[in-house]
C-alpha cells in the first residue's frame, strides 16, 4: 500500500486509521520550543462520520486510503437504496441510507453527486454545493410583518426545511447551499 509522510498532510487527504478510511479536515504543524515537532490533525471517519483529533510525530508515515471519488448522476430512491448512474459507462450504483445520511434532503433527480467508493462500495454521498428546489409550503408573507429576523421557515420539494426571506411564496424555485442548508437566492 502507498504511504504518506506527516510532512505531506493537508486537508482532504484520505488515510487508513484502525482499518477504516478517514479524511483529514484540518492539519496543524506544531514545533514546540523544547521537544520533537508534531502534527495535530482533525480527522473524520468516513464510515461512522465521527470526528476526532490525533497527533502524529513529525516524520511518521500513514497508509493512504484506497478510496475513489467519482461523479455520478442521482436517478431515484426506492425506499431502501438511492440509485446513481455513471454518464459515460451507464453503470448504476446503489447507495444505502447510511452512505447518504443527512444529504438525502438535497438529492434532486439528474443532479451530479460525488460518491466515495471503498472496496467498490459507496461509503459517502456528497451532493452538489448548490441545488435548486421548489418551495412546497411556507407561511404567507404579510406586508409590514418584518419584526424579528425577517425570515420564515419554508418546506422544499425534498422535505428539507430552510429559512427564507418573507417575500418567498409557495411554488417559487430557490437556490440553497447544501453545505450550510441556507437560502442563497431565487431562481429566475
Swiss-Prot record:
One of its GO terms (biological process) is peptide biosynthetic process. The gene is efp. This is Elongation factor P. Belongs to the elongation factor P family. It holds the Pfam family EFP_N. CDD domains: S1_EF-P_repeat_1, S1_EF-P_repeat_2. May be beta-lysylated on the epsilon-amino group of Lys-34 by the combined action of EpmA and EpmB, and then hydroxylated on the C5 position of the same residue by EpmC (if this protein is present). Lysylation is critical for the stimulatory effect of EF-P on peptide-bond formation. The lysylation moiety may extend toward the peptidyltransferase center and stabilize the terminal 3-CCA end of the tRNA. Hydroxylation of the C5 position on Lys-34 may allow additional potential stabilizing hydrogen-bond interactions with the P-tRNA. The modification N6-(3,6-diaminohexanoyl)-5-hydroxylysine is found at residue 34.
Amino acid at each position: 500500500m502507498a504511504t504518506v509522510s506527516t510532512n505531506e498532510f493537508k486537508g482532504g487527504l484520505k488515510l487508513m486509521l484502525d482499518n477504516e478510511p478517514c479524511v483529514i479536515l484540518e492539519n496543524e504543524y506544531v514545533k514546540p520550543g523544547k521537544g520533537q515537532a508534531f502534527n495535530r490533525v482533525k480527522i473524520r471517519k468516513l464510515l461512522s462520520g465521527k470526528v476526532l483529533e490525533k497527533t502524529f510525530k513529525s516524520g511518521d508515515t500513514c497508509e493512504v486510503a484506497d478510496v475513489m471519488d467519482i461523479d455520478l448522476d442521482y436517478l431515484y430512491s426506492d425506499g431502501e437504496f438511492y440509485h446513481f448512474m455513471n454518464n459515460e459507462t451507464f453503470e448504476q450504483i446503489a447507495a444505502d441510507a447510511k452512505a447518504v445520511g443527512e444529504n438525502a434532503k438535497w438529492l434532486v433527480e439528474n443532479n451530479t453527486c460525488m460518491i466515495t467508493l471503498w472496496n467498490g462500495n459507496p461509503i459517502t454521498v456528497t451532493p452538489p454545493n448548490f441545488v435548486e428546489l421548489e418551495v412546497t409550503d411556507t407561511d404567507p408573507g404579510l406586508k409590514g410583518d418584518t419584526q424579528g429576523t425577517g425570515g420564515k421557515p419554508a418546506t422544499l420539494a425534498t422535505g428539507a426545511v430552510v429559512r427564507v426571506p418573507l417575500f418567498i411564496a409557495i411554488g417559487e424555485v430557490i437556490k440553497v447551499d447544501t453545505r450550510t442548508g441556507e437560502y442563497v437566492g431565487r431562481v429566475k
